[in-house]
Design a protein with these regions (language model features):
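Short, solvent-exposed secondary-structure boundary motifs
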Residues: 1, 27-33, 55-60, 83-87
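Generic structural detector for well-ordered beta-strands
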Residues: 9-13, 52, 66, 95
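Hydrophobic pocket/interface hotspot
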Residues: 19-23, 29, 49-51, 67, ...
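Generic amphipathic, hydrophobic interface segment in small proteins and small subunits
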Residues: 39-56
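Hydrophobic-ligand binding "helix-grip"
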Residues: 40, 57-103, 111-113, 140
Length: 146
């Protein structure tokens, strides 16, 4: 199989707008984000971002994905490639879903595709934990600001 999807979610006791404010404040990432330590770039579709991640079971790495989508207080997505298109691609998504009680469900996912997915499946699966940690730290950070 040449694709793998990792999906996590968490409920945050804050509005989507409040979560969005923190999620898109890239300068604050170093103070709360355990996984994505640095993001440089603007929130414009087509923009090349510069992202530094620190997976718990791998070395830190930097990559330059292209911003695919930005919907204020709703969703954010980018697409990155390892070396060349089709070798190992990752489409990263954050989706903010408003709940009836005024809270937010964050759906945090990535779909990996390409020729290297079968060989890297176990390494890629370990990223689920990093997403879960990041989600938890985001929740704590957002809720502490209320």
């Amino acid at each position: 199989m040449l694709s793998l999807k990792i999906t996590t979610h968490i409920y945050i006791h804050a509005t989507p707008e409040q979560v969005w404010q923190v999620l898109t404040d890239f300068k604050s990432y170093e103070s709360w984000n355990s996984f994505i330590r640095k993001v440089e770039g603007k929130l414009n579709i087509g923009e090349k971002l510069k992202i530094r991640i620190h997976p718990t079971k791998q070395k830190a790495m930097e990559f330059k994905p292209t911003l695919l989508g930005v919907k204020n207080a709703q969703s954010l997505s980018w697409l990155g490639h390892f070396l060349i298109l089709g070798l190992l691609d990752g489409e990263h998504h954050f989706k903010l879903c408003s709940q009836e009680d005024g809270s937010t469900c964050l759906v945090h996912s990535e779909t990996f595709s390409g020729l290297l997915v079968p060989m890297m499946r176990n390494n890629l699966k370990s990223i689920r934990k990093d997403f879960e940690y990041m989600n938890q730290f985001l929740k704590l950070f957002v809720e502490s600001k209320l």
